[in-house]
Amino acid sequence: MAGVFSYESSEVDWCEDNYKHSENVVEYFNTMSSFIFFVISPIMLYLLHPYAKERNLAVHLVWIMMVFVGIFSMYFHMTLSFMGQMLDELSILWVLAIGYSLWFPRKHFPSFVKDRTSFARLVLTITIISTLSSFVKPTANAYALNCFAIHILYSLFVELKSCTDERVLRLAWASIGLWVLAISCWISDRFGCSFWQKLDFCYLHGIWHILIVMATAYASTLIAYLDASQEIPYSLPDLQYWPRNNWAIGLPYIVLKGTNTTRKTC
Ligand SMILES: CCCCCCCC/C=C\CCCCCCCC(=O)N[C@@H](CO)[C@H](O)/C=C/CCCCCCCCCCCCC
Ligand SMILES: [Ca+2]
Ligand SMILES: [Zn+2]
């Protein structure tokens, strides 16, 4: 049992050289880059609070769980232990489960599901089964998790096919662009390590951490905005960027322009 906590007990080892900067931290840059989770999560919790208050406070679970993903990611890269790998991957699975339960469009629910509560129960059941199955072939977990991004991309494509709103489309393209950059780094670190070692640049997995957190901030805000437009249209949701709306780079969030003024009564 103690073996699962041992350093390097995971079968996964990223391109970064082990113990290069510290004898206690296996992958130093990969560990430190996970700090981005602790920077972005509190900001997103703060920015999404008005939307969460109006829609459902459970929305906050997404970014609260992202803090745990950050903790487990740090622990995993610090030790490369089997326990670290499983905690890292299972926390991502549970963030996805929360996201699907909250935001998967009602109109695409399977016909036997009558409301969002039943849908959330179905997601919970599938997630518990997936959690148990993840121990069968742990090296396959990361690939399975990455497939969810493909499904999210497909769902966004279906939702935005007929959208002409410039701000929404801009956010969609930014989310997709960030994800493409992120997954290119992840794949390149996984499969192109000998090439990157020749260039003495083995930091792509750390860069992936930064890009995937940004992609999650962008894509989850877009999905939450589409959800708000359908579920709480009376609150007149709109998109803005923090810290300045007119800056090219910023964190997207939802403002509710109609709360308390135009709320429907029936
Ligand atoms: C209608 C559905 C709405 C769901 C929205 C919720 C989206 C957020 C989901 C997940 C958060 C991703 C957190 C990534 C943490 C990375 C930690 C890490 O690096 N782990 C690696 C090991 O250190 C491991 O190998 C990585 C495994 C793969 C993770 C795949 C995550 C899927 C990301 C989905 C992002 C959405 C982007 C959408 C693009 C338009
Ligand atoms: Ca390594
Ligand atoms: Zn990682």
UniProtKB/Swiss-Prot annotation:
Signal peptide: none annotated. One of its GO terms (cellular component) is endoplasmic reticulum membrane. InterPro entries: ACER. It catalyses: an N-acylsphing-4-enine + H2O = sphing-4-enine + a fatty acid; N-tetracosanoyl-sphing-4-enine + H2O = tetracosanoate + sphing-4-enine; an N-acylsphinganine + H2O = sphinganine + a fatty acid; N-(9Z-octadecenoyl)-sphing-4-enine + H2O = sphing-4-enine + (9Z)-octadecenoate. Ca(2+) binds at residues 13-14, 16, 18, 27. One of its GO terms (molecular function) is N-acylsphingosine amidohydrolase activity. It is a multi-pass membrane protein. Zn(2+) binds at residues 77, 205, 209. This is Alkaline ceramidase 1. It comes from Danio rerio (Zebrafish).
